[in-house]
Amino acid sequence: MSDKQGLTVDAILTNLKQSNIEWQQVLENVISAFDCTTGTIHFLDQGTELLQIQAHKGIPPFLIPKLSTIPIGKGMAGIAAERKEAVEMCNLQTDDSGVARPAAKETKVEGSIAVPMLLNGKLYGTLGIAKPVPYDFTEDERNSLLKIGEEMSKALLA
């Protein structure tokens, strides 16, 4: 992780301690910090156990209805929520594991990662970002995203 990215991640973590959080801005800051173009934030509806879209960027409008509500275990976000760990693809376009839903390929992104928003082992949602090129996220990047997810969870409880 570069110093620039480290400072940006620190700035994101600091912003998550504010009382009035703009989730769209948080997502845009994360996308920028990790040199990505696309992203989503889903919050877990504790009553229905469904992930509900809270913020998105770079998603084609016709796909929004398909990812507004995601069941646990479906697609990258749903699997990250189910496993409570990061789910990553170097190239979503060529993936044939079944993890990515068919509609996900219509985003035209390649390197992508979804991380759970966890606090003390409890799921609060997911954060997903992607690049338009094949990419493997580093362990430092995964850890930073998980830390951001933890701080997002704390912010939801504040």
Model regions and ranges:
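Short, hydrophobic-rich beta-strand element in sensory/regulatory alpha-beta domains
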Residues: L27-I31, T37-D45, G78
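Regulatory sensory and allosteric helical modules in signal-transduction proteins
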Residues: L44, P61-T94
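A short, aliphatic-rich beta-strand micro-motif
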Residues: E110-L118
